[in-house]
């Protein structure tokens, strides 16, 4: 039987320098961990009002220029939302575009 040779990337093992987790058994939980090269993740969760798990947390990592990037996030009955200076924000719509949208919606 023919088996093509597949080369595997040579990944360096990155050590986990801290790893903490808890689960209270009532839907409340949390975790955080950090790697030796600066990745840091933390989150906490609790039961939501509609049967879902609500979770909020953040992750940080080092960019190639040496600065730290951070993203904070929330997920609940309203959906997933992330906040970070890294995430582009849309430019405000001009007044004429907003008026066109309102007019189009009124024509439905």
UniProtKB/Swiss-Prot annotation:
Q: Which residue intervals define the domain Chitin-binding type R&R in the entry?
A: 26-91
| Residues annotated as glycosylated | 89
Q: Which GO terms describe its molecular function?
A: structural constituent of chitin-based larval cuticle
Transmembrane intervals: none
Q: Does the keyword Cell inner membrane apply?
A: no
Report the GO terms under cellular component. Answer: chitin-based extracellular matrix
The record's keywords, sorted A to Z, are: Cuticle, Glycoprotein, Pyrrolidone carboxylic acid
What does the entry state regarding organ or tissue expression? Arthrodial membrane.
List the disulfide bonds in this chain: none
Q: Which Pfam families match?
A: Chitin_bind_4
- InterPro entries referenced in this protein's UniProt entry, alphabetically: CHIT_BIND_RR_consensus, Cuticle_Struct_Prot, Insect_cuticle
Q: Which residues carry this modification: Pyrrolidone carboxylic acid?
A: 1
Q: Which PANTHER family match?
A: CUTICLE PROTEIN (PTHR10380), CUTICULAR PROTEIN 47EF, ISOFORM C-RELATED (PTHR10380:SF173)
Q: Know the name of this protein?
A: Cuticle protein AM1199
- Organism, by scientific name, is Cancer pagurus
Source organism lineage? Eukaryota, Metazoa, Ecdysozoa, Arthropoda, Crustacea
């Amino acid at each position: 039987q023919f088996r093509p040779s597949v080369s595997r990337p040579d990944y360096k093992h990155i050590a986990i320098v801290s790893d903490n987790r808890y689960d209270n058994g009532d839907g409340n939980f949390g975790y955080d961990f950090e790697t030796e090269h600066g990745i840091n993740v933390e989150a906490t969760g609790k039961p939501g009002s509609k049967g879902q798990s609500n979770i909020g947390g953040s992750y940080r990592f080092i960019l190639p220029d040496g600065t730290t990037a951070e993203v904070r996030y929330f997920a609940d009955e309203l959906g997933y939302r992330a906040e970070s200076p890294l995430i582009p924000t849309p430019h405000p719509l001009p007044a004429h575009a907003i008026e066109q949208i309102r007019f189009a919606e009124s024509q439905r």
